[in-house]
Curated annotation (Swiss-Prot):
This is Cell division control protein 7. Residues 296-310, 376-394 have a biased composition (Polar residues). SMART domains: S_TKc. It comes from Schizosaccharomyces pombe (strain 972 / ATCC 24843) (Fission yeast). It catalyses: L-seryl-[protein] + ATP = O-phospho-L-seryl-[protein] + ADP + H(+); L-threonyl-[protein] + ATP = O-phospho-L-threonyl-[protein] + ADP + H(+).
Amino acid sequence: MHNIQASSITLGDCLGKGAFGAVYRGLNIKNGETVAVKKVKLSKMLKSDLSVIKMEIDLLKNLDHPNIVKYRGSYQTNDSLCIILEYCENGSLRSICKNFGKIPENLVALYTFQVLQGLLYLHNQGVIHRDIKGANILTTKDGTIKLADFGVATKINALEDHSVVGSPYWMAPEVIELVGATTASDIWSVGCTVIELLDGNPPYYDLDPTSALFRMVKDEHPPLPSNISSAAKSFLMQCFQKDPNLRIKTRKLLKHPWVIMNQTSSKFSDAIDEVQKYNERVKESTLTAIIEPTSNRINPTLHSGRQSSYHMPESPKTPIAESPDHDNWDNEFQGTLKISDDVLKKSEHFMDFCSNFKGKNNSSSITSSPSKSRHAFNSDQISESNNFNASPLSTPLKAQFDPSKPALNRSIDHQKTPQHKRYLSTEFKENIPDGIEKFVETPRDSEFTDIFPTSSIKVQGLRKETGLGTLVLNKCYGSWNNEENEDGEESDIFDSIETNLENLDIENNIALDKRTHLASLLSSLLGSLRDKNIGSKDTTVSQIASILSEDLSLKREIIQAHGILPLLETLREIKTPDVQLLLLKLINTVAFDDHTTLQKVCFAGGLPLMLSFSNREHSFEFRYESAIFIQQMYRTSALTLQMFLSSNGLNSLLLFIKEDYGTNRDFVFVGVEGIWKLLRQQDYIPKNDICTMVVNDSLEPLTKAMLKALATDDDSSRMSLTRICEILLALSQADNYVKESLLCESALRRILRILLYLPHSDMAITLQFFKQLSMVPSSLSLLRKVHIIPLLTHILGDSKIEKGRKEIRSEALAALFNVCKLDKKSQEEAVISGAIPLLQEVIIKDRLFKEFALPILLALPQAGPVSRIYLWQNKCLDFFLSLLSDLNWQSAVFDTIASWLQFELREVQRVLAEKRNVQLVLKVFCISQSASSNRMLDTLGRVCQISPRLAASYGQPIIFQKFKEKLTHKGTKPIVVLNIFQIMKSMCEASSQSVAYIAHCGLPDVVANLNQTSDSVLVKELAKDLLKYLKVPQGPINEHKSPISKPHMPPPRWQPKQPLTQ
């Protein structure tokens, strides 16, 4: 190893610091070269890592390309390993973005081309970068781009064991899922870096690292910047192919039009000038849009913009000459609409028919009279009355008014008057969308009287609840114009009526007259409310209430007489509490369950007035009436729900939730249901805004109501409990601000205290709430503090949970996964709580949940000595070895075993060196699929470097035969060749028998051939070292004579026959 002496390097100023150490500017006093010195603390690495890193540095010194930072060597001090690198004076592209702003697209394309050239060289040499980002792309004075922090530097940056390795915002999905890094992973990182340079930040930078990792795996591709060219979008979509096997290669990406057409080279100073000018232009255009006088675009007057339909446009100053054919538009449509003569003749015939039909109708007084009676009202009356056909209010609300008591002035305490439950109902009622209610069927639609003809006109009895008779006219399918029957005799359609008319009851006529009188009196009283000269209106309001109590259907007359506005104005004027309460009851009665009337109340300005009575300064009766109105507002239609929210109705709901559940629980029901409804209507109302307003108040009242609802055993409380759970889940699905606002220790403790007592469906919803909350990194310490981990562990092992067990275990396991994934303290607490045997059981029995359980278990060897003690107690090393047969997880499991070997070399080595385990590892490696075995090569090389004993044990003929197959395959990548050579070198150093096995398999010829023919500098260097161990001359290959004689070797005892089952 040709390392630089420490005395030849003088350190200068510090360029940057990190968890691993620091980077300094240095000077090589022997040749005067300025270098960068990366000092890595020896305390941050294991002894086994140190020798490997030194070896790799010596190997990487051979790499030389204009677009990569060159390794100069290394030296070691008492406390640090110093790595000498080429110095790039102008810093990184990340620093350019930070200091000068976004980089223009043409310059990004130029930089990307150079990045890809350097990356292609690394890939051809068998090196995966693993950490491409703007901070690792350096620039020189002449504008050259150089890739830094590849190879050894990447491993050093990841020395903080089991943290988010490298840079999570640039990580490929397969790396996040622990499948392993490949050259395709670098291509994904290139795409993320391009977005970073174009947009200033990488994808998902607004999210916390855990949420970003989740989105990278789940989303089809990261969001692309909106202001880029189509060529740039095409380039990025090639980089963001989800399947790494289908992702484009570096060589092909260099031929993409986006990087080809932007090849104008520029110096660093010119590039900085271009970046500065670009960002100045962006700022200028933004400021112009803000500072520019709005008079040229928006006229701040009442009649600005387009002409109002209520005002005539100004007449032009210059008269416009009228064209000769001013009203003739035939020429305008000539050639676009051709009407045939046949159609025109039919149209003329139809017009003649219509005129004849009208003449017959006008001449017949008998047939026209029913029509005239139906159209006696004006159009406004018809449109108003149509809203009340088959009204659902008449029957249920009739029971509220006792004729023996004064009208509407009695107490409506729900405990004294059970009838009032139909007002504040907790039963869910789905809204009818606006514009659809006219298509809703009524009971009358099922009579089919317009389909099946009858021979007579029936006069039905008067309905008591309306006081009106219903005349049902049924006619035959024959035309009304037929004046004679088949026998030629004139028929009288009213023959059958005479006998039925004799049956009319005089009482019905009296009821009809009485209703007419009451309607007239009601109209008069409403008129008197409008009269400003009347002093006291208390008596008038009482009389209106009395009339309405006599006949509830008369509320239609109030609506048709436009009585809503007088009632609201009177409510504003009158200060007498009894009359105010009576008016509130009147308005609620008229508007109950009728979205049209509710909208009229809102349009008349009544919504803020009605909401004002929900404040605590008013008595229970007033707040109760306000609650009735509020419930109708959010239940009736989407439009009224939007009106309610726009008038700060959410504040009233939050006030209701704060009420005492024991005495005023109806208010709590209204508050909970209202917020639940608002969060469900996400198509109309921004869900995140509602969540923000809810958490800005407090989470305490909601959790207290949850506790009280669980303690009360009735249907309304159970429904309210479910809705509170769903509200909490909705809040946890909002943005990070809302999630962080939910981190209230007392509230979370209250929820966890009742979690095990919730119904199973509500328990699953609440566990989803904690799962979402656990995705915020700032929540981990608090969740650990409130002891959620022992509770989740208990739920996983609770055999009493039967109904919904699968869903509950799934949510609990997902929450435990989020809490433990990146936090060692949480992992240790889970281990102490008894999670290991439960996770093992899940992995064995349930393949669906294995995706969550196994990563938790695989992280534990690096969690600390306490965790490893529990791993030994539960025989987890043997358990991991048994999992090597799973093709989907074998590389991740083998990597975990290698990590455990680094921490506890003697104990783990003893188990792995057992004959059955050695054969198992060799068997798994040799019969695994190509992609999986390639991923295992890197880990196997690490194991052989750490443990010479294991290297000697694994050096058997069967593995060398596998190596030969891979080395002689034409498509073998340089990185695979490098890994194989490193493993063979470690095996030769560990055992002379391995040298004999290598010779027996014919590998020396293969190695010598690659030494001569490979394009990779690193492959050639390793081949030379390997041939020294094999004692093979390094001259030209003699094809007719083997360089060494092959000793007679017995065939291997085991040969792979069939692949392992997954």
